[in-house]
């Protein structure tokens, strides 16, 4: 009877070993026998948990690999367009022979256009480097008390000329003492991106309003515009990288909203996008305490 028990346990160990080999060689389907008691049952349970964990890690790595491949394709596309245009401009400048007034004027115009394209590529590289820092965790976000009113005013400064040109008025409503804990510089970049998005979707001008409040649980910032709103088709994609809505007027990169979401996510916050009943878009930011 003792010998029979030894043979049974050896057979179970051999079966478990065979299953582990199949797993190691990458078989998709595997079946670990159930052992009711003893060391083999404990070992079998640990192997099962290890396999599940390794499969989950492999799936996550594959998702990250696919994401990186998509990112590289998007970046290549974003760079290819201005570089192709610059190549064509260089070719056309070479064909402009002579030193007449008309030739000089055309060369100056095309050189100006090339400079604009170079600036665009430079801006894209800067934004991508910031996104890379956020993704890799190397971006150092400070945690300090931020006045929400000061943050909004600072965030709107770079957009003052654009708002004037497009007839957009900034409306503020909130308590001067309301605040949250976060990084002022990164938070300002996120808010600027959301405000810029609103301006780009307001073809006929209007009010770009920011309201805020602080509760015992979170601080809230609400940004609304009087633009065309977000279509049902676009709403699920609004925070995706390189996604540009059909109603945007300017040729941006489609990274601003994704960056804004990433910045606040790093600060224990969330951003939600929705449409207003009276028209236009609404972005609600919550930063938890």
Predicted feature locations:
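Short alpha-helical segment of the dimerization/phosphotransfer core of two-component systems
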Residues: 59, 113-121
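Conserved catalytic submotifs in the C-terminal HATPase_c
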Residues: 142-145, 164, 169-179
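Short helix-loop "hinge" at the ATP-lid/N-box region of the Bergerat-fold HATPase_c
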Residues: 198-199
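Short beta-strand/loop element within the Bergerat-fold HATPase_c
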Residues: 205-217
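Acidic ATP/Mg2+-coordinating residue in the GHKL
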Residues: 225
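Short conserved segment of the HATPase_c
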Residues: 230-243
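Conserved glycine-rich
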Residues: 269-270
């Amino acid at each position: 009877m003792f010998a029979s028990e030894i043979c049974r346990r050896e057979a179970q160990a051999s079966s478990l070993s065979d299953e582990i080999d199949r797993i190691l060689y990458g078989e998709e389907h595997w079946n670990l026998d159930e052992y009711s008691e003893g060391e083999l049952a404990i070992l079998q349970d640990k192997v099962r948990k290890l396999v599940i964990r390794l499969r989950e890690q492999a799936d996550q790595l594959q998702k990250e690999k696919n994401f990186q491949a998509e990112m590289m394709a998007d970046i290549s596309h974003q760079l290819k367009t201005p570089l192709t245009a610059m190549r064509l401009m260089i070719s056309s400048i070479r064909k402009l022979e002579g030193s007449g007034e008309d030739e000089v004027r055309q060369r100056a115009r095309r050189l100006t256009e090339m400079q604009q394209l170079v600036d665009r590529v430079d801006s894209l590289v800067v934004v991508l480097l910031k996104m890379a820092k956020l993704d890799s965790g190397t971006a150092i976000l400070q945690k300090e008390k931020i006045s929400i009113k000061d943050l909004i005013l600072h965030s709107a400064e770079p957009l003052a000329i654009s708002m004037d040109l497009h007839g957009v008025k900034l409306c503020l409503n909130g308590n001067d003492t309301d605040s949250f804990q976060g990084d002022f510089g990164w938070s300002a970049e996120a808010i600027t991106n959301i405000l810029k998005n609103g301006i780009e979707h307001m073809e006929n001008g209007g009010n770009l309003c920011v309201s805020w409040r602080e509760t015992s649980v979170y601080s809230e910032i609400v940004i609304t515009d009087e633009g065309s709103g977000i279509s049902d088709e676009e709403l699920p994609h609004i925070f995706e990288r390189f996604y540009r809505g059909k109603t945007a007027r300017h040729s941006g990169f489609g990274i601003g909203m994704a960056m804004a979401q990433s910045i606040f996510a790093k600060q224990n916050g969330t951003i939600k996008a929705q449409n207003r009943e009276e028209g236009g878009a609404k972005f609600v930011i919550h930063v938890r305490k």
